[in-house]
Amino acid sequence: MAILISYFCFLLIFFLFTLILFFGLNKIRLI
């Protein structure tokens, strides 16, 4: 159970990091 929760947290952090990186690259392109 604990492994599943930790894996889910890691996935959520990775998704958020990818989303921030994607928006950051788009902002750099627009400038």
UniProtKB/Swiss-Prot annotation:
Q: Does the keyword Transport apply?
A: yes
Keywords linked to the UniProt accession: Chloroplast, Electron transport, Membrane, Photosynthesis, Plastid, Thylakoid, Transmembrane, Transmembrane helix, Transport
Q: Does the keyword Chloroplast apply?
A: yes
Q: Tell me where the signal peptide lies.
A: none
Any idea which GO molecular function terms this record carries? electron transporter, transferring electrons within cytochrome b6/f complex of photosystem II activity
Q: What is the membrane topology listed in the Swiss-Prot or TrEMBL record?
A: Single-pass membrane protein
Q: Which GO terms describe its biological process?
A: photosynthesis
The family note in this entry says: Belongs to the PetL family.
| Record function comment | Component of the cytochrome b6-f complex, which mediates electron transfer between photosystem II (PSII) and photosystem I (PSI), cyclic electron flow around PSI, and state transitions. PetL is important for photoautotrophic growth as well as for electron transfer efficiency and stability of the cytochrome b6-f complex.
**Can you say what this protein is called?**
Cytochrome b6-f complex subunit 6
**Naturally occurring in which organism (per UniProt):** Gnetum parvifolium
| Origin organism lineage | Eukaryota, Viridiplantae, Streptophyta, Embryophyta, Tracheophyta
